[in-house]
């Protein structure tokens, strides 16, 4: 027996629907509103009174009017999962939007699911090797961890994301899910075609709810991407989940909260900010079967790190990767700031004494170089003591050795991409710190993989 209701009020994306008081739909149930030539999906958010519910539309409410029929589907929004989703582009409801033909999947999961229980979770901290030297050495990622990716426009966030997708696919046989939350459609379009060109698309599922979508879609699209990731994790895969941008998830939640009439909290955000963020982040974790490692681009409004949105996000992050414009100006890519980026995994009990010592010494030498730069700018390098000259020489080599050619950027740079295992990364930097390569020109260190590549380059330069 189908449970039908009638639309009694529409205010933008908010729809009030009257049902029989005996058959009120459950919270978070999906409703189908028949709008003639199309069906609009809405999600139940509140029960108001004995026989009325308030729902938020997941699609445009254009063309809806009072008196239209709404069908209670009896379950929450469900999206397709499984290997069929790879290489395809979906919206919040799991419908393909890439125009690449029909789509069928054997299974679908509801987007609202409980986080794994304590017994199911894997608590052993394990390094997630990315093959990117600057990340693996100074701010390593945790398997099943959450990483914040900070950076302005044009500093290389997208290329870094693509390289991570490429590396997890090729080196770990893992899969990726990219979730575009409230960002520009043009950027999503560019990313889709760049992924197609660089060959990583068939190992990735993409889910988009962009800036032009209603707030309900932007609020729930992160859950759609997460649900697809959870399926792969439960099948024993290591999954990389990208969320771009986590701030827009909070922003959409704030819009919905205001539309539902909740009293705003600090800086106008929703009073349920911490709860909503926790419900999303707690589902991103490793279990005994597989892992979801999440990389989340974080927009910081007005560069204010104390704003409730980024501040709530920070509480959940295990590592931060900060991209710096000053480093792009030096022509060093990836433009990761080695001193600003950090990780909870940089602990001798997890990564081992040798790796920890090398990382700390690299940070110290770069910090000292930063302090000396003012003196060099005013007096010149010749005025430095012999010890400081040595520090500057090694720091400049380290700075250049932190650069690396990326596989996904081969067609632009003409350089073959390099994947560097952690062991090789630590050994290379240890040798530079010990002064074994003080006689090699610093230009030989730029855009190389291992220290052997540097020595080869130096030999070629001598010829």
Curated annotation (Swiss-Prot):
This protein's GO CC annotations: plasma membrane; proton-transporting ATP synthase complex
Record membrane topology: Peripheral membrane protein
Catalytic reactions on record: ATP + H2O + 4 H(+)(in) = ADP + phosphate + 5 H(+)(out)
SMART domains, alphabetized: AAA
GO MF, one annotated term: proton-transporting ATP synthase activity, rotational mechanism
Keywords attached to this entry: ATP synthesis, ATP-binding, Cell membrane, CF(1), Hydrogen ion transport, Ion transport, Membrane, Nucleotide-binding, Translocase, Transport
Cystine pairings recorded for this chain: none
Subcellular location: Cell membrane
List of residues binding ATP: 151-158
Pfam family, one: ATP-synt_ab_N
First-listed, main subcellular location of the protein, grouped into a coarse class: membrane
E.C. number: 7.1.2.2
Binding partners and assembly: F-type ATPases have 2 components, CF(1) - the catalytic core - and CF(0) - the membrane proton channel. CF(1) has five subunits: alpha(3), beta(3), gamma(1), delta(1), epsilon(1). CF(0) has three main subunits: a(1), b(2) and c(9-12). The alpha and beta chains form an alternating ring which encloses part of the gamma chain. CF(1) is attached to CF(0) by a central stalk formed by the gamma and epsilon chains, while a peripheral stalk is formed by the delta and b chains.
NCBIfam families assigned to the protein according to its UniProt record, in alphabetical order: atpD (TIGR01039)
Family: Belongs to the ATPase alpha/beta chains family.
Biological function: Produces ATP from ADP in the presence of a proton gradient across the membrane. The catalytic sites are hosted primarily by the beta subunits.
Annotated protein name in UniProt: ATP synthase subunit beta
This protein's encoding gene: atpD
């Amino acid at each position: 027996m189908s449970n039908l209701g009638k639309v009694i009020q529409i205010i933008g994306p908010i729809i009030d629907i009257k049902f029989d008081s005996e058959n009120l739909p459950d919270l978070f149930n999906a409703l189908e509103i028949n709008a003639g030539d199309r069906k609009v999906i809405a999600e139940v958010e509140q029960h108001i009174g004995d026989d009325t519910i308030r729902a938020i539309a997941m699609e445009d409410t254009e063309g809806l009017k009072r008196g239209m029929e709404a069908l209670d589907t009896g379950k929450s929004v469900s999206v397709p999962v499984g290997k069929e989703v790879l290489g395809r582009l979906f919206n919040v409801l799991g419908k393909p939007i890439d125009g690449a033909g029909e789509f069928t999947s054997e299974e679908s999961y509801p987007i609202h699911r409980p986080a794994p229980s304590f017994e199911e979770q894997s608590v052993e901290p394990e390094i997630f090797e990315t093959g990117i030297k600057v990340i693996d050495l100074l701010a390593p990622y945790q398997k099943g961890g959450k990483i914040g990716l900070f950076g302005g426009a044009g500093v290389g966030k997208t290329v870094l994301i693509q390289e991570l997708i490429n590396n997890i696919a090729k080196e770990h046989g893992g899969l990726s899910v990219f979730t575009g939350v409230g960002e520009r459609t043009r950027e999503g379009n560019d990313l889709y075609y760049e992924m197609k060109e660089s060959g990583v698309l068939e190992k990735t599922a993409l889910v988009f709810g962009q800036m032009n979508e209603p707030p309900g879609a932007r609020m729930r699209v992160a859950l759609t991407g997460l649900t697809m990731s959870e399926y792969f994790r439960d099948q024993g895969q290591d999954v990389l989940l990208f969320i771009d941008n986590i701030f827009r998830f909070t922003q959409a939640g704030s819009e919905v909260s205001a539309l539902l009439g909740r009293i705003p909290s600090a800086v106008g955000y929703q009073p349920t900010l911490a709860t909503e963020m926790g419900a999303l982040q707690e589902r991103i974790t490793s279990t005994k079967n597989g892992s979801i490692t999440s990389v989340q681009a974080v927009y910081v409004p007005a560069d204010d790190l104390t704003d409730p949105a980024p501040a709530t996000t920070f509480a959940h992050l295990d590592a931060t990767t900060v991209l710096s414009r000053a480093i792009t100006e030096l022509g060093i890519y990836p433009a990761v700031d080695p001193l600003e980026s950090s990780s909870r995994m940089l602990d001798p009990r997890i990564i081992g004494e040798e790796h920890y010592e090398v990382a700390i010494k690299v940070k110290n030498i770069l910090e000292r170089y930063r302090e000396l730069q003012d003196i060099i700018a005013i007096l010149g390098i010749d005025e430095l003591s012999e010890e400081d000259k040595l520090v500057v020489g090694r720091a400049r080599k380290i700075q250049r050795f932190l650069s690396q050619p990326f596989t996904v950027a081969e067609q632009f740079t003409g350089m073959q991409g390099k994947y560097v295992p952690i062991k090789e990364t630590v050994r290379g930097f240890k040798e530079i710190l010990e002064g074994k390569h003080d006689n090699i020109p610093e230009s030989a260190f730029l855009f190389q993989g291992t220290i052997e590549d540097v020595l080869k380059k130096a030999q070629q330069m001598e010829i």
